[in-house]
């Protein structure tokens, strides 16, 4: 499908539809848009020279109604052709979607955007994105502290740099503005000309069992200073009072039942359930554990550390890449597990060969 003026394939409230072995290019807006559908699959497609490549807006986090859509084994490149920022290879909204074994590359801004509940991004090869931007990540999420149980696992994210000189460089994963509860494990980050994993005032992120090679910085985990709290919560127009809007979105139903202990409490009279926003703007419950950094900064940098509660343990910092990988000079990061485990006893195996189109 080529030279489509508005959008490519739009599937509204569809179920069990498979879009497979297609080439889609030269769309003015979105190549594939799944709106409200369940258990659909986009697989083995070549999508290039488009604006948005794939948008999935399905399932419902508030009622814990899963979408179950799968984006698998696609080659996606040269997206964001018209709008150079905030148009992605894959955008996820809702609940229960999977993005796996895709090769995503060659674009000016981020590759994947997500929010919601129980989404999984795994075994993808992402490179050469965020080439003409700043303050961004190859995988980006932000301003949804009600997002829960999302996973970024087993991805190879590499060769990320921007042509723009800025004090706020690009990186691999950026969890911005109070985004919460992401498991980041088993990933390999290589040649990141900025911070590989950046978190701004998030909670319950578990960053464990990852490998960082030739990254300017492994992780930067912060809490905002007090003056920024009011600014981000109420004053910035594009933030749209996101802290309070998020509160309104989840103050009911199955979501409240599942996450009561984490996010709710009773008011002073002990009878009314309210969202527990106590110190919401500070980073808490963060874990940085059993990660291997090779040829990078000796330690992650934690800004505003007095406001940021993070557990740091079991990490290893080294300079001899050949000790830990089969052929790092040729970008073969197949791990030597015994060597890594001798340095990090709790480290579990990472399959570099799985981080690609299957």
State the predicted function of each range.
Residues 1-2, 16-29, 38-51, 65-80, ...:
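Right-handed parallel beta-helix
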Residues 5-10, 28-36, 51-57, 80-88, ...:
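Short glycine/acidic-rich loop motifs that flank beta-strands on beta-rich extracellular proteins
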Residues 13:
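Extracellular repeat turn/loop positions enriched in glycine and acidic/polar residues, especially those
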Residues 59, 117, 142, 176-178, ...:
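Active-site beta-loop-alpha junctions enriched in small/polar residues
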Residues 60-64:
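Short, small-residue-enriched loops and turns at beta-alpha junctions
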Residues 142-144, 173-176, 195-202, 275-282:
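Short, contiguous acidic/charged loop-to-helix segments that flank catalytic cores in large enzymes
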Residues 179-180, 270:
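Active-site clefts of carbohydrate-active enzymes
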Residues 222-358:
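Acidic, glycine- and Ser/Thr-rich low-complexity intrinsically disordered tracts
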